[in-house]
Amino acid sequence: MSELLRNIDGRTKLAGTNKLEILMFTLGLDNRTGRCETFGINVFKVREVMRVPPITHAPEMPGSVEGMVSLRGVLVPVIDLAKYTGVQTDIKPGIMVVTEYNGHTQGFLVEAVDTILRLDWSAMRVPPDMLNAQMGGLVTAVTELPDGRLVMMMDVEKVLAETGHFNDDLALKAVKPLGISDRTVFFADDSAVARKQIVSALEAMQVNHLSAINGRKAWDELQRIANYAESAGLPVSDMVQVILTDVEMPEMDGYMLTRMIKEDKRFANIPVLMHSSLSSESNQQLGKAVGVDEYVPKFEPQKLSQTLARLLTKNRKD
């Protein structure tokens, strides 16, 4: 298992190349379907993989939260992904995948880990509507392996939001209206939970917004906007004042999207704000390397609104 994740820190050099590496895992044979589905998680978010340690159970926790474990003196919540996804299996999870999102550490119980797969984000597709409905919006991207198996990228942000890790209701109440009616933010994110949080923050600010569900669709839409502005003799910055992007997205990731935006002179005066749960300093530095202007962690709507307010008013023409 240590061999599987060896040099995981060095894998961050893939950022900006539209490539990623995913740790594949299974949740056990589902007695209802007779299938053992394969899921994936970006190795950027994996801290370690271990045998399941002793778990301290606590009352009044969501059904899929097994309890807490102590890792080097830090209490970490543990989520049983089979229970969360509704997989009915007789197999007891034997592996815990320790992950970090937005500075929060949690353990995910799985049946087994398979291998680490390197691929291009262009090989990751938006899940078909049927699969999306079947999985309750839990899958953000899918890819097919040479042996015909389907690997599904799990929307971990949705898991964490629904198991009580992120609750932004109170923070949203502190978001103030911008007081300017002619500002527009364009954002790209593949997570339905993240998109909902962004929209809530922007609506609280009373800011106009446009969006796309992945980097490729975002780039296509931004090109359409830029072409329209060019034909009308207007700067693109008259139509969009800030571009907000996630990092992990099927077809094109946020690093590649940012690089392409920065290489197109029509977007020269429009800041790119990276909005991601990849919270390590190394990932922030990688964003800066491709031209990201600012970084805001996900699920912190007050920080998001404050940063957007500053960027939206910075170069405003009165």
Regions found by a protein language model. Name each.
Residues 1-241, 247-256, 263-268, 277-289, ...:
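An acidic, low-aromatic, low-complexity terminal/linker signal
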